[in-house]
């Protein structure tokens, strides 16, 4: 009975994940349709696939070297620094979402609903970062940089409260601190590295 239950759960999880990613892709195009971006479809899909693969691989590698650091309450996924790619290309929105989804589905230590909750938090953060990419303090899109902390604090904080217990406030705070530490330090460094080398006009261009 347990075997059949596992098969049913994983089958349902993969089916739900396919539907969810289809929704992410469709909603991304709908939300960006009014921006009339010069976009090469092949380049867009290639960027999204590469970003997804890098996110999933980096997170798995970190978990092998430092077990648990990608799934604890104060989780510090190094791959979350890649969120800044959403400032440069809309392909990062489905790319980061799919990368998060792949890791959460292939790592046994994630919470039961993390493949949906975590992916939704990543999608909303990436979308918000793309939308606020031109809102800058000095040369830094500071408003966008805090978006991963906000979305993950609320959604993953709620998930931790449901499955692990403790107060929502403290869980949300722990998640936010982990996100801020990675995105504000590593993410900011990656952001300036991309702009300094004009990679946003070459590797991350869509036309």
Regions from the language model: what does each represent?
Residues 10, 15, 21, 30-31:
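Short hydrophobic targeting helices and cationic amphipathic motifs
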Residues 23-38:
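Short, Lys/Arg-enriched N-terminal segments with co-localized hydrophobic residues
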Residues 39-87, 91:
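Hydrophobic transmembrane alpha-helices
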Residues 55, 96-104:
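Small-polar-interrupted transmembrane alpha-helices in polytopic inner-membrane proteins
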Residues 63-72, 101-127, 131-207:
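Membrane-embedded alpha-helical hairpins and interfacial helices in multi-pass inner-membrane proteins
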Residues 85-96, 135-141:
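Membrane-helix interface "capping/anchor" motifs
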């Amino acid at each position: 009975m347990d075997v059949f239950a596992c098969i049913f759960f994983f089958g349902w999880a993969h089916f739900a994940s396919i539907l969810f990613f289809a929704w992410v892709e469709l909603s991304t195009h709908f939300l960006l349709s009014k921006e009339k971006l010069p976009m090469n479809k092949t380049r867009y899909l290639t960027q999204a696939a590469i970003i997804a693969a890098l996110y999933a691989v980096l997170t798995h590698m970190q978990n092998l070297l430092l077990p648990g650091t990608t799934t604890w309450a104060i989780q510090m996924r190094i791959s979350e620094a890649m969120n800044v790619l959403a400032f440069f290309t809309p392909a990062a929105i489905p790319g980061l979402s799919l990368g998060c989804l792949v890791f959460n589905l292939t790592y046994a230590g994630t919470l039961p609903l993390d493949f949906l909750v975590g992916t939704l938090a990543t999608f909303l953060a990436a979308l918000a970062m793309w939308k606020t990419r031109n809102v800058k303090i000095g040369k830094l899109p500071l408003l966008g940089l805090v978006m991963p902390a906000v979305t993950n604090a609320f959604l993953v904080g709620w998930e931790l409260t449901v499955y692990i217990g403790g107060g929502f406030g403290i869980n949300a705070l722990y998640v936010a601190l982990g996100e801020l530490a990675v995105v504000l330090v590593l993410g900011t460094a990656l952001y300036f590295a991309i702009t300094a080398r004009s990679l946003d006009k070459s590797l991350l261009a869509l036309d």
